[in-house]
Structures are given as C-alpha cells and as structure tokens.
Amino acid sequence: MPRTPEQYEEIRNGKRQLIINVALELFANQGYSSTSISQIAEKANMSKGLLYNYFKSKEELLHAIISKSITGMMRMIDPNNDNIISDEEALDFFDLFFSTMKNNTVEMKNYFQLTFQPEVLKLLAEGYTTKRDSKYAEMFINFFEKRSPKNARLKILNLISTLKGFSMQYVFAPEFFSDELVDAYKEYLKNVFIRGTNE
C-alpha cells in the first residue's frame, strides 16, 4: 500500500530531527569546526547526498539547532501564540522550563557545550538574530515593563542569566540537586520575577 503525503512528511520530519540530534551531539563533543558533514551522515546512518537534501551546509544545520532551541523556549512562554505573555503563562513557563531541564539534561548539556565554542559564538554574533527573535524580545520587554517600567531590561537580563546559570549547574552535575531543592528554587524564582515577592 503506497504511503500518504502525510506519512512521507512524517518520515521526512523524523529524518530531519535525527540529523539535528546527531549534529548537536557531535558538535558538542567533537567541536563544531572539527565535525564534518560526512561524520554526521555516518552517525545518522545515511548518505551525504541524502543529508544534503535536508541541509545545504553545516552552518545551516547549526542555525537549525539554534532555531529549534529558541522555538521550544518560546512555545513554553507563549503557548497560545498571541504575542502576549500573561501572568499565568509566565508562571507556567517556570514549570515547563524546569521540567525540560530535568528530563532533557543530555540535550541541554550538549547545547551549552555547543554555544560556548568560540567559533559558534562568532557565528551567532554575525547574524543569527532574526525578526522572530526581536519579536520574542519585545514580548519580554512588554511583560516586565508593566511591573517595573524603569528596570524592564535589567529584569530580563537578570532572569536570563539566572535561568542559564542554574540550568548549566544542573545539567553538568544533577546529582548535587535534590528534587525538593529544585522545586523550592523554582517557586522562589516565580515569587521574585512574577509574583513580586522574595519569599
């Protein structure tokens, strides 16, 4: 029985995701510059020609990895896609972020190892900011300006630095953090950044 267009699309999406996952692992552990398209294709168990049907270059593949991470983050913060962050969505975001951190430690660890490589940082600085990213930044600014008009950008910087710093500690050494401690810290951050209390 021939496959339907939907089935072909599902297969294609599956292979695309496989390539992204394999590339992230190799970029993180071998280095972006030291990893070749041939190595990615071999580990993904496909030919270079097939891989090039999905990604035209290694840089395009890197962009897909970064874009996937940003998209996943924004689905957490604006699930109804209305470009407005409500208080409820902001509180839910912390639950989703911490759940993702605890359930995807290897992927998040690989992502950190990738994005802190000098050559990757250079590529990010040279033009990976898109209109979509600017829209997301504006959403955060609007959310925090309602709470602290004078310090909205500082609040955003503090939030991003806090989440990145803690998640890095967690994914590289999760054995040092009990579930009780992580949950308590999550609620503390909700209080500080969303509810406006320090308790």
Label for each model-derived stretch:
Residues 1-14, 199:
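N-terminal intrinsically disordered/low-complexity leader segments
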Residues 1-2, 99, 134-150, 172-199:
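C-terminal peripheral helix-coil segments that are non-catalytic and often amphipathic
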Residues 15, 19-27, 97, 163:
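Short hydrophobic clusters on alpha-helical segments that form packing/core surfaces
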Residues 79, 103, 120-147, 153-157, ...:
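Amphipathic alpha-helical packing segments from all-alpha helical-bundle domains
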